[in-house]
A protein has these predicted regions:
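Glycine-rich, basic loop-to-helix element that forms the pyrophosphate-binding segment
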Residues: 68-85, 106
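Conserved nucleotide-sugar donor-binding catalytic segment
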Residues: 140-221
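Short aromatic/hydrophobic "clamp" motif used to bind/position activated sugar donors
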Residues: 90
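Catalytic core of nucleotide-sugar-dependent glycosyltransferases
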Residues: 144-150, 181, 208-212, 217-246, ...
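Membrane-interface aromatic/basic loop that binds lipid-linked glycans or pyrophosphate carriers
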Residues: 261-316
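Short, well-formed alpha-helical segments that are part of the catalytic scaffolds
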Residues: 15-28
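A conserved acidic beta->alpha catalytic loop
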Residues: 25, 41-50, 70, 94
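Flexible acidic/His/Gly-enriched loops in nucleotide-sugar-dependent glycosyltransferase catalytic domains
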Residues: 76-79, 108-110, 116-172
Length: 316
């Protein structure tokens, strides 16, 4: 019997408008690898389940549905789907995103030729709720090291291909379900960067639907704050796990400097912006921080920016 090469993890909830496009983009991939699509349908009140049932009837040997009742929530639904993935590799596609052609063939060929790589990932095109491309919005960049990822998540889950055996090791080592984190993927990327090798492929692999209602794109400041706090908890956990005492102290000191810099920006304290900006380590100075420091050098420009609010970068 041929080895099951790939499991595609699909988690979906209330996505009747998009789930057919998601499944079609996976089913239409050109390759000869044995594969399965494991779909976690999280007790949607809309017509998502009915659409999935129609696809299961057409592709009973490929699509493996998991119908939750009651609703499990994003994190538990995700790990339940992962637990049912039997392939050598796992790829992901949320029920409102879709893949671009040749993703499977490109990534599995690469992984088969590079056994030292635990996960590869690529670039996504942002789209809106209508499926229209957002101008100049792409996600995915070369951040393959633990230190780079600790500064923030830049890996689009819809573009990844990872080794299933390493996912199993991660779950045993970290037990993420007990942590209460609001992100299912970011902790795993951090763990992978320490226990294998990550590789960025500078190719568009998928389309990511950016919807205002999601936790990471919520327009509600309170929801955004809770999501950001969870990301910070994840970063602290892995910094403690993998850094020695000296490096951990440096990490916390830098985090505090960045926080003070942000607070100075909100309070429009030009002197403090310059003061804290100068001592933030070079590696931690994002493009946004560098731009702020450049612009605040001139008191006149600084005043104009805040009074007229010409440049959005100065708003929190």
């Amino acid at each position: 019997m041929q080895e099951l090469m790939l499991s595609v993890a699909v988690i979906t909830y209330n996505q009747e408008e998009y789930i057919a496009q998601t499944l079609d983009s996976i089913l239409s991939q050109e390759h000869n690898y044995p594969y399965e699509i494991v779909v976690g349908e999280d007790c949607s009140p809309d017509g998502t389940k009915k659409i999935i049932e129609e696809y299961v009837a057409k592709y009973p040997d490929i699509i493996k549905p998991l119908y939750n009742n009651p609703n499990k929530g994003l994190i538990q639904n995700y790990f339940n789907v992962i637990a049912h993935c039997k392939g050598k590799y796992i790829m992901e596609c949320a029920g409102d995103d879709y893949w671009l052609p040749r993703k499977v063939k490109t990534q599995i060929k690469y992984m088969e030729n590079h056994p030292d790589v635990g996960m590869c990932y690529g670039v996504v095109q942002y789209i809106d709720g209508r499926g229209e491309k957002k101008k100049s919005e792409f996600a995915g960049e070369k951040k393959e090291s633990f230190e780079a990822l600790l500064r923030g998540n830049c890996i689009p889950a819809v573009t990844i291909c990872m080794r299933n055996n390493l996912v199993t090791e991660y779950i045993k080592d970290v037990n993420p379900l007990e942590k209460g984190w609001l992100m299912e993927d970011y902790p795993m990327w951090l763990w992978f960067s320490q226990n294998s090798r990550l590789v960025f492929q500078n190719k568009k692999m998928a389309a990511y639907r950016s919807l205002d209602g999601s936790a990471s794109h919520s327009q509600d400041p309170k929801k955004r704050a809770v999501f950001s706090k969870s990301a910070e908890d994840i970063q602290h956990f892995f910094a403690k796990k993998y850094y020695d005492d000296e490096k951990l102290a440096q990490y916390y000191a830098t985090k505090e400097l960045v926080k003070l810099f942000s607070q100075a920006n909100v309070s429009r304290d030009r002197e403090s912006i310059i003061k804290y900006g100068k001592v933030i380590p070079k590696a931690e100075k994002t493009i946004k921080i560098r731009l702020k420091l450049f612009l605040v050098k001139s008191p006149v420009i600084f005043k104009l920016l805040f009074e007229r609010k010409w440049i959005r970068v100065f708003r929190k």
